[in-house]
Structures are given as C-alpha cells and as structure tokens.
Amino acid sequence: MKERLPHEKGFHVSWDQIHRDSRALAWRLDGQGPDNGAWRAVVGITRGGLVPAMIVSRELDIRTVDTISVKSYNWQEQQPPSVIKAPQAELMGDGHGILIVDDLVDSGKTLELVRTLYPRAHFATVYAKPSGRPMVDTYITEVSQDTWIFFPWDMALQYVEPYRGRD
C-alpha cells in the first residue's frame, strides 16, 4: 500500500472552527480549576497554542496570560523539543492552578517536556492524536495519528486561475 503524503489525509481547520472548538474547550474547563474552580493563569504554548489560549482566557475571564515557547519541529521534521522562552518563574511555581493550552498534542513530546517543568499544571489542547493523548488532561476533538491538521495560521488564501483560462 502506498504511503500517503501529509496533505492527502488532511483536516482543514478554519478560523471559525478553531474559534468554536476553543470556546468548547473553555466551557469544558470552566469551574474545573483547583482554587474553588478558578485558574490562576493561562499559558499558551507558542506558536500554535496562542490563539486557543487567548480564546480560553477571554471566555473564562482569566487576565493573567503568559507563553512558553517550545521548538520541536524544524520545518516539517520533528526534533527533540527544547524550551526557547519560559513563562515567569514566580507565576508558574510547580504549575498549581495554571492552565497550559496548545492547539494540538501529536506525539506528546512537547507536552511531556513542559509537564516535567510544571507537573501540577492542567494541560488542555483543542485537538489530540492517540500517541499524545496520555499527556493531555482535557481536549475537544481526537484525530487519527496519520491525519495532518492544517491550521488557518499556516494557510493563505490566494487567487486560483480558472480552469478554462483567464477572466
């Protein structure tokens, strides 16, 4: 059987879809924080987690927002993850009361690294693949491991020439 290219089994996510799914994630997390249901802060894993983190923080009215930047890909090649930018140490502690948000858990290597730094944080993603699912506490949609997710911030709308020639 011929191996598929990443785009051949693709899941295209629109801006509207990521917004709806991120709101659904917020609703699922509402009242689940350790401090009488509240979360102390939202930390987005850059870059993909920024949009979902912003939407979750807005929906849950969490005003303290920070980021952690983890590099685990060089173009489309996966590499060992490394932290490029960490959130404020005094905010994070061991992660208690912190909601860490990303767009997707794929292999789980990024979340595994972040979880070693903040073991008591709550990890939430919009989408989850089976290999990474054990690393996430809350997610909205599961997709198969061999599906490539196309996020709207990775895509560009462009003009396409009509099949029968020019306008």
Swiss-Prot record:
Which locations, inside or outside the cell, does it occupy?
A: Cell inner membrane
Binding site residues for 5-phospho-alpha-D-ribose 1-diphosphate: R47, G48, Q79, D102, D103, L104, V105, D106, S107, G108, K109, T110
Membrane topology label: Peripheral membrane protein
Broad class of enzyme this protein falls into: transferase
Q: Which InterPro entries match?
A: PRibTrfase_dom (IPR000836), PRTase-like (IPR029057), Xanthine_Guanine_PRibTrfase (IPR023747)
Cellular compartments per GO CC: plasma membrane
Q: What is its main location?
A: membrane
Superkingdom field: Bacteria
Range of residues in the leader sequence: none
Alphabetical list of Gene3D superfamilies matching this protein: 3.40.50.2020
In which residues is xanthine bound? D106, I149
- Provide the binding site for GMP: Q79, D106, S107, G108, K109, T110, W148, I149
Short name of one Pfam family? Pribosyltran
Q: Any idea which positions bind guanine?
A: D106, I149
Stated EC number for the protein is 2.4.2.-, 2.4.2.22
Key words, A-Z: Cell inner membrane, Cell membrane, Glycosyltransferase, Magnesium, Membrane, Metal-binding, Purine salvage, Transferase
> Which coenzyme or cofactor does it need?
Mg(2+)
Residues given in the record as Mg(2+) binding sites: D103
Q: Which PANTHER family match?
A: XANTHINE PHOSPHORIBOSYLTRANSFERASE, XANTHINE-GUANINE PHOSPHORIBOSYLTRANSFERASE
How it assembles, according to the record, is: Homotetramer.
Briefly state the protein's biological role: Purine salvage pathway enzyme that catalyzes the transfer of the ribosyl-5-phosphate group from 5-phospho-alpha-D-ribose 1-diphosphate (PRPP) to the N9 position of the 6-oxopurines guanine and xanthine to form the corresponding ribonucleotides GMP (guanosine 5'-monophosphate) and XMP (xanthosine 5'-monophosphate), with the release of PPi. To a lesser extent, also acts on hypoxanthine.
Q: Which HAMAP family match?
A: XGPRT
Family per record: Belongs to the purine/pyrimidine phosphoribosyltransferase family. XGPT subfamily.
| Name of the featured protein | Xanthine-guanine phosphoribosyltransferase
Protein's organism: Cereibacter sphaeroides (strain ATCC 17025 / ATH 2.4.3) (Rhodobacter sphaeroides)
Q: Which gene encodes it?
A: gpt
